[in-house]
Amino acid sequence: MKELLANRVKTLTPSTTLAITAKAKEMKAQGIDVIGLGAGEPDFNTPQNIMDAAIDSMQQGYTKYTPSGGLPALKQAIIEKFKRDNQLEYKPNEIIVGVGAKHVLYTLFQVILNEGDEVIIPIPYWVSYPEQVKLAGGVPVYIEATSEQNYKITAEQLKNAITDKTKAVIINSPSNPTGMVYTREELEDIAKIALENNILIVSDEIYEKLLYNGAEHFSIAQISEEVKAQTIVINGVSKSHSMTGWRIGYAAGNADIINAMTDLASHSTSNPTTASQYAAIEAYNGPQDSVEEMRKAFESRLETIYPKLSAIPGFKVVKPQGAFYLLPDVSEAAQKTGFASVDEFASALLTEANVAVIPGSGFGAPSTIRISYATSLNLIEEAIERIDRFVK
């Protein structure tokens, strides 16, 4: 029989986050008391008014195809959101709605990358960036942002990484997995290098609404019209409105790129789920109280978990400013407990301490683990106690 699989998928690395989450769920199904700190989604239910909007749309018969790039009403809601939150002006032909921000990113790389084009990715990175770039024929080029620099790349690092094959750089702020937020000044320095070298900026802003202790979100596209023209902004309702399962994300930027993405989407998904689009319209046009309530809950959890995690022997923790993750360096704790690697340490936490965390190797940071505080405070505190006992 001929080889069944294409070469391009043979080097794919399965999503670490989804794999650990699945293993934890499997253990729970066996009756094991597992506490999951690996979740990449809010633990709150979608607000009722948003669910009602989806139900109403179906009852009114809105169950057919929509335009491939999204409902005009949803595009308009997104345009108003950009005006309100980011002081950015976009036209409908500069917006595409897709099946979650992940799929929007995938579609973007498919339409902008030729074989061998390079995309600069800061380390630590979200697990899907390198895989999506490779699937589009691109080459990931990594810049390591250390804990000493708060896990944020510098303009000088970016400048040194650019070659004649560089097509784009990814900026994720607030960041998954670090929770760090770039300042306006840092983004201005990065944008200057991108403009000088004529490379596209891919700005992933999905955690925009989850900011703590006075941190402020600033979109790199806000710097100037020139920067905006060279930036594709990625966002969605998954994290801000606790709608991960609804699968609605979007991109805003250059009309030619957006048009190409829309053409590709017409052959891959037809359109995002119709009811989900109506739910997203309500998410942006309806009351925003729940967004702030969820943010406050995450902030409260962070203030509880950070000092306790920092007190565990061998844990070095940089306090995050956004998202709902911490990324402690636990190499010392792993060594202290007799493990050859942090991956083995993380695996033992699951099988022996019944706490699920994500090994940092999946994010390009093998000395770390990612801990999510998108779960109840009681469970978080119990999980930290288990980790503390395990290490001691």
Curated annotation (Swiss-Prot):
<dbReference type="GO" id="GO:0006520">
    <property type="term" value="P:amino acid metabolic process"/>
</dbReference>
<dbReference type="InterPro" id="IPR050596">
    <property type="entry name" value="AspAT/PAT-like"/>
</dbReference>
<feature type="modified residue" description="N6-(pyridoxal phosphate)lysine">
    <location>
        <position position="239"/>
    </location>
</feature>
<feature type="binding site">
    <location>
        <position position="40"/>
    </location>
    <ligand>
        <name>L-aspartate</name>
    </ligand>
</feature>
<dbReference type="GO" id="GO:0004069">
    <property type="term" value="F:L-aspartate:2-oxoglutarate aminotransferase activity"/>
</dbReference>
<dbReference type="Pfam" id="PF00155">
    <property type="entry name" value="Aminotran_1_2"/>
</dbReference>
<feature type="binding site">
    <location>
        <position position="126"/>
    </location>
    <ligand>
        <name>L-aspartate</name>
    </ligand>
</feature>
<keyword id="KW-0963">Cytoplasm</keyword>
<dbReference type="InterPro" id="IPR015422">
    <property type="entry name" value="PyrdxlP-dep_Trfase_small"/>
</dbReference>
<protein>
    <recommendedName>
        <fullName>Aspartate aminotransferase</fullName>
        <ecNumber>2.6.1.1</ecNumber>
    </recommendedName>
</protein>
<keyword id="KW-0032">Aminotransferase</keyword>
<comment type="subunit">
    <text>Homodimer.</text>
</comment>
<dbReference type="InterPro" id="IPR004839">
    <property type="entry name" value="Aminotransferase_I/II_large"/>
</dbReference>
<dbReference type="InterPro" id="IPR004838">
    <property type="entry name" value="NHTrfase_class1_PyrdxlP-BS"/>
</dbReference>
<keyword id="KW-0808">Transferase</keyword>
<dbReference type="GO" id="GO:0009058">
    <property type="term" value="P:biosynthetic process"/>
</dbReference>
<comment type="similarity">
    <text>Belongs to the class-I pyridoxal-phosphate-dependent aminotransferase family.</text>
</comment>
<dbReference type="GO" id="GO:0005737">
    <property type="term" value="C:cytoplasm"/>
</dbReference>
<dbReference type="InterPro" id="IPR015421">
    <property type="entry name" value="PyrdxlP-dep_Trfase_major"/>
</dbReference>
<dbReference type="GO" id="GO:0030170">
    <property type="term" value="F:pyridoxal phosphate binding"/>
</dbReference>
<keyword id="KW-0663">Pyridoxal phosphate</keyword>
<feature type="binding site">
    <location>
        <position position="176"/>
    </location>
    <ligand>
        <name>L-aspartate</name>
    </ligand>
</feature>
<dbReference type="InterPro" id="IPR015424">
    <property type="entry name" value="PyrdxlP-dep_Trfase"/>
</dbReference>
